[in-house]
Amino acid sequence: MTGRVPFLLALLMLAGPAWAEHPAECRVAANLIEPDFPLPQVVRALAAKRLSILVIGSGSMLLPGADGSKNAYPARLQHALTEMLPGVEVKVVTDVQAHRNAVETVKALKPALAAAKPAPALVVWGIGTVDAIQAIDPDQFSHALDHGINIVHSAGADVVLINAQYSPRTESMIALGTYAEHIRWVALQQKVPLFDRFSIMKLWADLGTFDLYSATKKLDIAERVHDCIARLLADLVIEAAKLDEPHAESGR
């Protein structure tokens, strides 16, 4: 890996921070997307100039319509990272199923990891919405998260957790905040980065950046939200990789 280190360090310096260059509606305070933990497997993948990502979760990760998968944030994440990482081949694949909760996602993890080619260096796990709707026991939910993260790490990949979407229409009916706190706690205990989609979208709603009351009815708003999520998630991945730069120099 020694010969790749100069390329890697130059690449990460070139890649960010990029949130100031995003469309104005996408910009948020830097602390909302600053990772607490590194992504060592992503660093190795960048050094090899080939980054494969598996996005797994429920149907909320995609958009409706014939072009839904193309316009949703997983596809946009691939585009954003490709732009930010010149010289790196980026591939994002999805394993998404409607109404899939945490326990069901854990059962799907091993087959999804085995099916993804090349083997993913990173798993982006969107979680919380379905569990909140189904009122899954929070302890069972946390246990499933722990188990799933261990499966991914055993397969040689990093994990980024993404909590639920914020929706002012359902906030009073579904305890999304409760599950968001459990996700945050598990992320801290497991030392994995958390992309706090819930807080970011709540900020947008509070500021009037996006009319999230009508987002379910207006596809153009949903597409813009997904575009911003992809851009900010790409930033988090890059920043988390930078946290592991000393290990890259030592050949970890």
Question: Would you name each region that the model predicts?
Answer:
Residues 1-7:
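Bacterial N-terminal signal peptides that target proteins for export
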Residues 15-17:
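N-terminal signal peptide c-region/cleavage motif recognized by signal peptidases
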Residues 22-29, 60, 94-100, 124-134, ...:
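Cell-envelope and extracellular/periplasmic
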Residues 22-94, 111-117:
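Serine-esterase "nucleophile elbow" of acetyl-processing enzymes
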Residues 42, 54, 61-62, 88, ...:
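Oxyanion-hole/transition-state-stabilizing segment in secreted/luminal serine hydrolases
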Residues 52-57, 91-96, 121-127, 158-163, ...:
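Structural recognition of the beta-strand scaffold that forms the well-ordered cores
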Residues 124-130, 148-180:
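Active-site segments of SGNH/GDSL-like serine hydrolases
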Residues 165-252:
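Catalytic His-Asp segment of secreted/periplasmic serine-dependent ester chemistry enzymes
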